[in-house]
Amino acid sequence: MSDDKPFLCTAPGCGQRFTNEDHLAVHKHKHEMTLKFGPARNDSVIVADQTPTPTRFLKNCEEVGLFNELASPFENEFKKASEDDIKKMPLDLSPLATPIIRSKIEEPSVVETTHQDSPLPHPESTTNDEKEIPLAQTAQPTSAIVRPASLQVPNVLLTSSDSSVIIQQAVPSPTSSTVITQAPSSNRPIVPVPGPFPLLLHLPNGQTMPVAIPASITSSNVHVPAAVPLVRPVTMVPSVPGIPGPSSPQPVQSEAKMRLKAALTQQHPPVTNGDTVKGHGSGLVRAQSEESRPQSLQQPATSTTETPASPAHTTPQTQNTSGRRRRAANEDPDEKRRKFLERNRAAASRCRQKRKVWVQSLEKKAEDLSSLNGQLQSEVTLLRNEVAQLKQLLLAHKDCPVTAMQKKSGYHTADKDDSSEDLSVPSSPHTEAIQHSSVSTSNGVSSTSKTEAGATSVLTQMADQSTEPALSQIVMAPSSQAQPSGS
């Protein structure tokens, strides 16, 4: 055995023998490969388990927290302010309370004024109905107030270099709204605002949209009254059936988000080419003076109240087009398919009607042409029969003495034809027909169409009535009359 396989493998634990050195080298190479890549093969199984599949990727994202919504920096402040308003304002939670949106402004609410250098104040309570805050007699370039009933944007931040107006609608609190105005310091000069106001629109999903409102006020002689009239807060209770009252703030917040989305999709963006933020129908920024207030602001005609007037005409057109698109998008696919099939059926019926009319016209034309063709064929048949009869008569009178005499005389002129006609008329009309037929066949001279028609009719009658004795009489009669004409 050892003599047959002298080459022994030197690997530990392997006592195989081979007949030649080549087999041993191949075997050793296998040992080397196993020793070198054995652990790597075991690790490859673990790597395969760590393949980043979509499920594992989503799981890792959830563990890291990428799918969590980012907390808004303003959300805590707004939540605190709304909770304070809910605590301080008594709510009527009786079973007979129904959701009501008051469209009429009855009593004033609180307007807070602070120095421009002071930090942004938190919203205060709006339950003091008779409270008035005196303001310093300072010139203010812009003074605007927003009706909360028509404002559909929950968080709006309006800032400028000289004054800032913060408009806030507390979304969790459906019965409170606060208007805060900051007046500039009295020792600063009033400078007209050259550029537009930067407006920061804060959306409920945590995003901010920068927009701009043009400052069209150029004169600075704006008088601020001694006491700013206060406006009673308008309750923003959503009129949703099945919800008795504003006890749960979460549905109110979702309702506000839905209304904001509807407003953004229904209208064009809130500020385009100098338009101010609009609500559903009457959400326009008004001047601080109202007709029912004794004190008013004296502003020029280029106030911010008149800037939305010109784009108001284009709003219905955009609303109409967006309404059509929205109706088209909201249609049921089954309804779309039904309308599509109905239009197809109507088009197919119209096409079939047109094709039917066209086929009927073609059939009528074919019938007319076939009738005309039948008439022409019958006429051709009659003419052929007549030609055959004339040929038979011609062959019958080929050896007639009148024909031979006419060949001798010649009938060189048409006058001689007429004279022969006059001479032959008293004897018999048959002679006239025979003379004309013989002249036309022997000499090839064409006569008038009238004489041809007469000859044709006479020959037809002769074909019916011709007998041998009659032909002899007809031949003998002109023989005596033809001699004077020849002489």
Curated annotation (Swiss-Prot):
Residues 300-316, 437-449 have a biased composition (Low complexity). Residues 362-390 are annotated as: Leucine-zipper. SMART domains: BRLZ (SM00338). It is found in: Nucleus; Cytoplasm; Mitochondrion outer membrane. Keywords: Acetylation, Activator, Cytoplasm, DNA damage, DNA-binding, Membrane, Metal-binding, Mitochondrion, Mitochondrion outer membrane, Nucleus, Phosphoprotein, Transcription, Transcription regulation, Zinc, Zinc-finger. GO terms for biological process: abducens nucleus development; adipose tissue development; amelogenesis; apoptotic process; apoptotic process involved in development; BMP signaling pathway; brainstem development; cellular response to anisomycin. Transcriptional activator which regulates the transcription of various genes, including those involved in anti-apoptosis, cell growth, and DNA damage response. Dependent on its binding partner, binds to CRE (cAMP response element) consensus sequences (5'-TGACGTCA-3') or to AP-1 (activator protein 1) consensus sequences (5'-TGACTCA-3'). In the nucleus, contributes to global transcription and the DNA damage response, in addition to specific transcriptional activities that are related to cell development, proliferation and death. This is Cyclic AMP-dependent transcription factor ATF-2. It comes from Rattus norvegicus.
